Amino acid sequence: MNRLSCFLLVIGLCIGLSNANLIWNEKNTVFFKSSLGRNNVLKIHCTSEDNLGFHFLRPGETYDFSFHDSIVRSDFYCELWQGPNFKFHASFMAYQGGGLIVHYGKKNFWDAREDGIYFTHGKETPKLEYKWK
């Protein structure tokens, strides 16, 4: 197998294993949903090279942001709070990309529930990733 064939095979496998689309200009999106109990507000703060500010979600509400991967790195670090006086907290990398492999149309879904933060790319059932501290 020549080098070009090997390269194309590796690229094809990377695309096939990714949840990204083949639309080359489609932005990546990070979604947040509050599935918390009644009267429990979710506070979200995400940063990368930019500060995306604070967002407050009531149960059932959503917040999302979209972006193109950077050739250098595309990292979005997020902090979430909930409960009385926002005493329960979780912090995590909500999106990591860019660099060697640039994603197009990748989707990360985060769902805040009473027992923690659940994650899915949208194709599978959400799984508990982080517990509240």
Curated annotation (Swiss-Prot):
One of its GO terms (cellular component) is extracellular region. InterPro entries: Self-incomp_S1. It is found in: Secreted. Disulfide bonds: none annotated. It holds the Pfam family Self-incomp_S1. The keyword Signal applies. Its main location: secreted. Keywords: Secreted, Self-incompatibility, Signal. One of its GO terms (biological process) is rejection of self pollen. The keyword ATP-binding does not apply. Residues 1-20 form the signal peptide. Belongs to the plant self-incompatibility (S1) protein family. This is S-protein homolog 9. The gene is SPH9.
